[in-house]
Amino acid sequence: MHFGIPSLFYLYILFSIIMRIKCVITKNLKKTKKRTCSYIPHGNMEKGIILNYIEKPNPAYLKRGKNKNKNKNKKGDIYKLRNVEILLYANRYVHEGNENFSSTTKKLLLTPKVGNKMPEGKKPDWFHVAAPTVAKYNKLKDDIKKLNLHTVCEEAQCPNIGECWNIGTATIMLLGDTCTRGCKFCSIKTSSNPLPPDINEPFNTAKAICEWNIDYVVLTSVDRDDLPDGGASHFAKTVELVKFSRPDILIECLVSDFQGNIDSVRKLAFSGLDVYAHNIETVKRLQKYVRDKRANYDQSLFVLKTAKEINPQLYTKTSIMLGLGETKEEVIQTMYDARKNNIDVITFGQYLRPTKNHLSIVQYISPQMFEYYKEEGLKMGFKYIASGPLVRSSYKAGEYFIKNLVNQRNKDKKN
């Protein structure tokens, strides 16, 4: 086809117009995307200002670095923050503020994710723990190794291992060291087909516990969905052997949900244990982000409620990790749900990321907030609450729980 000079000129004009339109569209898209971000005044975190900037994003902001003074807004100096930062600030108000304005900030609810940016700055001072005393620590470690046992203290990289092992307390992990589930917060190794349970484990566990001469022991396990009863009979046999050797000892069993199998729950509930524990782990909204897809909030509550109904003499217990993006309102609601299902004891601790392949921490919760949750929980009627940054489900379980039981018993005698 032959084009004359006028035709080429018109094609050039048409091409220029198309490119111009494309540039305008691209620019508008970028501007639209930019305006969907939220901006807040740096150093001024008042509730009203946060909500104002969340609902009506202002494109005027103060860039970090050079040309600061050229980008001032009538409302004050504005810093452009990434979405994750603005959400973190807003969540702090929802989590720690006196007023509840979560309805306005529903779209800001945070979720944890592997690989997300961790909170800035060094780890708070309250996470510093003392080094273990060598003698007691080594003795306990040798006993566990000699009897081919596993502890959740080691497998889950618990920060309190030195403190607990120094006083001769360990949480023994039954059914091997490999879990059939893959929760995103847990460092225990996983497999869909782990080795069969060690038939000598119940006997070795009873032997170790008798040698340690302790008053309270916690038995836990990995999830074993590959076993017909989830490992309930193995648990029950261990409890029976320990109680036969030491009838006076108090036994807490921190178990899986057994996939909601009532027969498994019944088997364990009548084994002779004193405390039936199963962890909810997090608030309802965050379950799918934190736990394996086979676990869920309602099933966990059902298992604890069923255990109590089967054997009313049992104490039931659960635990929640904080710092995964939950709000204060959600934590309070979780406590209400636990009490509604007749759970006696609840513990709160700060989630700490085991490795970079696990969920990032969304927020460090202050000791004051842990104390607040404890006070609120006691008002709801929990028999005992352990709440603090380094508290874990099994952390000083005997010391806390026995002390509470004694106090409650003495109070009942007076009445």
Swiss-Prot record:
Keywords recorded for this protein, A-Z: 4Fe-4S, Apicoplast, Iron, Iron-sulfur, Metal-binding, Plastid, S-adenosyl-L-methionine, Signal, Transferase
GO biological process per UniProt: lipoate biosynthetic process
Entry-linked CDD domains: Radical_SAM (cd01335)
Catalytic reaction(s) noted: [[Fe-S] cluster scaffold protein carrying a second [4Fe-4S](2+) cluster] + N(6)-octanoyl-L-lysyl-[protein] + 2 oxidized [2Fe-2S]-[ferredoxin] + 2 S-adenosyl-L-methionine + 4 H(+) = [[Fe-S] cluster scaffold protein] + N(6)-[(R)-dihydrolipoyl]-L-lysyl-[protein] + 4 Fe(3+) + 2 hydrogen sulfide + 2 5'-deoxyadenosine + 2 L-methionine + 2 reduced [2Fe-2S]-[ferredoxin]
Record GO cellular component, one term: mitochondrion
Catalytic class of the enzyme: transferase
All copies of domain Radical SAM core, residue ranges: 165-383
Cofactor note (record): Binds 2 [4Fe-4S] clusters per subunit. One cluster is coordinated with 3 cysteines and an exchangeable S-adenosyl-L-methionine.
InterPro entries assigned to the protein according to its UniProt record, in alphabetical order: Aldolase_TIM, Elp3/MiaA/NifB-like_rSAM, LIAS_N, Lipoyl_synth, rSAM
Record GO terms (molecular function): 4 iron, 4 sulfur cluster binding; lipoate synthase activity; metal ion binding
Signal peptide positions (record): 1-23
This protein's pathway: Protein modification; protein lipoylation via endogenous pathway; protein N(6)-(lipoyl)lysine from octanoyl-[acyl-carrier-protein]: step 2/2
Subcellular location(s) per record: Plastid, Apicoplast
Cofactor(s) demanded: [4Fe-4S] cluster
Protein's UniProt name: Lipoyl synthase, apicoplast
